[in-house]
UniProtKB/Swiss-Prot annotation:
Protein family membership: Belongs to the class-III pyridoxal-phosphate-dependent aminotransferase family. HemL subfamily.
Location relative to the cell: Cytoplasm
Keyword Lipoprotein among UniProt keywords: no
Modified residues (N6-(pyridoxal phosphate)lysine): K275
Annotated GO CC locations: cytoplasm
EC number: 5.4.3.8
Protein name: Glutamate-1-semialdehyde 2,1-aminomutase
Lineage: Bacteria, Bacillati, Actinomycetota, Actinomycetes, Mycobacteriales
Keywords linked to the UniProt accession: Cytoplasm, Isomerase, Porphyrin biosynthesis, Pyridoxal phosphate
InterPro entries: 4pyrrol_synth_GluAld_NH2Trfase (IPR004639), Aminotrans_3 (IPR005814), Aminotrans_3_PPA_site (IPR049704), PyrdxlP-dep_Trfase (IPR015424), PyrdxlP-dep_Trfase_major (IPR015421), PyrdxlP-dep_Trfase_small (IPR015422)
Gene that produces this protein: hemL
Length: 443
């Protein structure tokens, strides 16, 4: 396809599908950000995807810069993954028993992240972080957890406080239904502030079971850790007998073959994984030092279980994705992110729009800000009202960016020259829309 057929001509079918969905699903979606709450307008109902292209229910095609919020590093419907999934499904969808494939996937992941000696497979990133926190408490005999403002670790009660992702998108401080008791043992500190961490350990060190942090946050937008930040967290936790939990649900096996660990090799006690590791199907994992992981049932007293954990079809998708993602794939991911960042910066500069484009490997974000964004407060203080007009100008031109200023942009290795032509054609209009926006432009 060429750049001449790029305009989105109608969203009538998506609008009807959204109306139908709202009649049976709260808000019409099964994850809040998909409702376009932050940007307004009609959510696109996607019916198929191949390579770097999405097709909606009205037949419009979009160059995909979301990649299912990260997992699709190879692009959509990659032949190797489709074949592996088809073969696995033909042998049965779920057994409720151990399978060879789950051991293969665990071994593949352990081979890439040196501190991970044992791995437990689960069904979602939320399960992974919830279980890692429980395990840290069970291992240390302590109750308090430190998390950071803007870091999102799933929707488990104890970790929703001042979270990023959809919580930031909707402007919620936490969530109704999270009781004071559930959050009482969660200490929330500003991100990238080591002095706050040290002071908190000085006051509460003997009560702190763990610090949990995104390896490089992407759920308040991409806000990378300061140089040496994760290593300093490792040192402080080790000094006080607490565990360090590094959440690589987003970065794991995306930003490098070994995830963020391959860029910043800090030996955390526990890691969490998701997204890429299962190739777009529902699965996640947590793992770490054998001494800690062997406190899990059935070896130890810390209970964790799941009927569908280690699902053979998801395991097959994950193995195929990881084994197909060779050095050439990671080089393409980095090159595509570089190319996208240059196009974004060029268009916004030409339009006179102050901006920051922070990077975490091949993940990036766009903040409308004159100064660097280093924490959640700075992200929220950026000119987020410019984002909705920017987003819709891209969407109307057949480019599918993230529908929130507080989410990461993702590229796939399949992003091709035709897609980049479309993006380049769309960006000047989108940048002008951002330039002309006012605070009243908010949806």
């Amino acid at each position: 396809m060429g750049s001449t057929d790029q305009a989105v001509t109608s969203v009538r079918r998506s609008a009807q599908l959204f109306t139908d969905a709202c009649a049976v699903i709260p808000g019409g979606v099964n994850s809040p950000v998909r409702a376009f709450t932050a940007v307004g307008g009609t959510p696109r109902f996607i019916t198929e995807a191949h390579g770097c292209w999405l097709t909606d229910a009205d037949g419009n095609r979009y160059a995909d810069l979301v990649c299912s919020w990260g997992p699709m590093i190879l692009g959509h419907a990659h032949p190797a993954v489709v074949e592996a999934v088809s073969r696995a499904a033909a042998n049965g969808l779920s057994f409720g028993a151990p399978t060879p494939t789950e051991t293969e996937l665990a071994a593949e992941m352990i081979g890439r992240v040196a501190p991970v000696e044992r791995l437990r497979l689960v069904n979602s990133g939320t399960e992974a972080t919830m279980s890692a926190v429980r395990l840290a408490r069970g291992f240390t005999g302590r109750s308090k957890i430190i998390k950071f403002s803007g870091c999102y670790h799933g929707h488990v009660d104890a970790l929703l406080a001042d979270a990023g992702s959809g919580v930031a998108t909707l402007g919620l401080p936490s969530s109704p239904g999270v009781t004071g008791a559930a959050a009482a043992d969660t200490i929330v500190l500003p991100y990238n502030d080591l002095e706050a961490v040290r002071q908190t350990f000085a006051q509460h060190g003997e009560q702190i079971a763990a610090v949990i942090t995104e390896a490089s946050p992407g759920n308040m937008g991409v806000v990378p850790p300061g140089r040496g930040y994760n290593a300093a967290l490792r040192a402080v936790t080790a000094e006080h007998g607490a565990l360090l939990i590094v959440d690589e649900v987003m970065t794991g096996f995306r930003v490098s073959r070994s995830g963020w660990y391959g860029i910043d090799p800090v030996d955390a006690d526990l890691f969490t994984f998701g997204k890429v590791m299962s190739g777009g199907l529902p699965a996640a994992a947590f793992g770490g030092r054998a001494e800690v992981m062997e406190r899990l049932a059935p070896l130890g007293p810390v209970y964790q279980a799941g009927t569908l954990s280690g699902n053979p079809v998801a395991m097959a998708a994950g193995l195929a994705t990881l084994r197909t993602a060779d050095d050439g794939v990671y080089a393409a991911l980095d090159a595509n992110a570089d190319r996208l960042a240059r196009l974004l910066a060029g268009a916004l500069t030409d339009a006179g729009v102050a901006h920051q484009i922070p990077r975490a490997g091949n993940m990036l974000s766009v903040f409308f800000s004159e100064t660097p964004v280093t924490d959640f407060a700075a992200a929220r203080n950026s000119q987020t009202w410019r984002f909705a007009p920017f987003f819709h100008a891209l969407l109307d031109a057949g480019v599918y960016p993230p529908c929130s200023a507080f989410e990461a942009w993702f590229v796939s290795a399949a992003l091709d020259d035709t897609a980049f032509e479309r993006i380049a054609d769309a960006l000047p209009t989108a940048a002008r829309a951002a330039a002309n926006a006012t605070p009243e432009s908010r949806p």
